[in-house]
């Protein structure tokens, strides 16, 4: 490689029913012929006991230093209890947890009302994700991270209220 990007760190997404180990093996196989340096941010959506006790520590030992969890989207969302377990595991191994913080229930509530009213054009996506959904989830996630003494990176901050919570 001459100039340009010399490294790439995409997300490797674990979905429900998949192991972290298998997810990383699949992504490493896809990157096998890479001519640049690569690593992965891991998306964790199924933090089973095995994932927390064995597979995440193995991933950290294998060079994964950060991962992302979602507080919204039905196929990716983790519960508050799972988030606490993930934060503690990450803290123990010196890894960084990132989160997409939006209140899933509020978004689903808004979507159902918009769809029922016939408001389905793409411009209503933003309406279905009100600032209150972001602010509540950022507040909740940061309080949980502070409670267990774990670092947390909030991604996609798009509101003044959310930014103010992060700044505090």
Describe every region a protein language model picked out:
Residues 12-17, 42-48, 73:
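Acidic, glycine-rich active-site loops and adjacent beta-strand->loop/helix elements
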Residues 29-47:
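A glycine-rich helix N-cap at a beta->alpha junction
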Residues 8-9, 39, 98, 153:
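Structural detector of well-ordered beta-strand residues that form the stable sheet scaffold
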Residues 27, 38-40, 70, 125:
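Aromatic side chains
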Residues 1-33:
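Metal-associated gating/positioning segment near the N- to mid-region
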Residues 22, 36-37, 93-95:
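Short acidic, glycine/proline-enriched helix-loop-strand junctions
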Residues 50-168:
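Histidine/acidic residue-rich metal-binding segments in metalloenzymes
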Residues 3, 36, 62:
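Structured loop/turn residues at beta-strand edges in well-structured enzyme cores
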């Amino acid at each position: 490689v001459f100039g340009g990007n010399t490294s790439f760190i995409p997300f490797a997404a674990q979905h429900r029913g998949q192991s972290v180990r298998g997810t990383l093996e699949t992504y490493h196989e896809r990157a096998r012929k890479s001519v640049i340096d690569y690593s992965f941010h891991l998306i964790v959506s199924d933090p089973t006991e095995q994932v927390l006790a064995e597979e995440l520590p193995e991933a950290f030992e294998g060079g994964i230093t950060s991962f992302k969890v979602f507080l919204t989207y039905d196929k990716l969302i983790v519960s508050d209890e799972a988030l606490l377990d993930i934060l503690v595991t990450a803290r123990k191994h010196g890894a960084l947890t990132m989160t997409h913080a939006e209140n899933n229930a509020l978004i689903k509530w808004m979507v159902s009302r918009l769809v029922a009213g016939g408001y389905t054009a793409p411009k209503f996506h933003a309406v279905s994700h009100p600032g209150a959904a972001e602010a509540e989830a950022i507040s909740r996630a940061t309080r949980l991270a502070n409670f267990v003494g774990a670092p947390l990176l909030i991604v996609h901050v798009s509101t003044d209220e959310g930014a103010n919570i992060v700044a505090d």
